[in-house]
Amino acid sequence: MPPAPRLKIGLSACFQHADPARPLFTGKTLQYVEQSIAHWLMSAGAMVVMVPCPTGETARGDVTLDHYAEWLDGIVMHGGADVWPGNYGEEPLREEWVGDRVRDLYDLAVVKAFAQVGKPIFGVCRGLQLINVAFGGALYQDIE
């Protein structure tokens, strides 16, 4: 019997926005995956593909998140910074916390694209919180 085909699993991108103090890639937004999550998926036999944000100042071509959702077998949403409270209808408890609107919008669009085609969506830490928000849930902003 031939071996089962490997699953193609997307991994949402993490962002490092342009930073003039960064010694390399100054002025450029970086998109990346966290190595241990990619290795965890690979250890289960999956082919792992980062799903880059298709928008921004350097966007080229016509590839969309919908294309990735059709092609891949599922998506894992990365961890990271807290989801901005405005995304679930609340004002931030602390004014200085502005969140990462670019990443929030990207992550919400990824979840929407995969949900529309009925593909599995899994979240790690922030990713799980974001899935909750994408489907209409709310969060506690701070637990003391």
Predicted regions and their residues:
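Glycine-rich beta-to-alpha active-site loop
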Residues: 123, 128
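N-terminal beta1-alpha1 cap of cysteine-dependent amidohydrolase-like domains
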Residues: 1-122, 133-140, 144
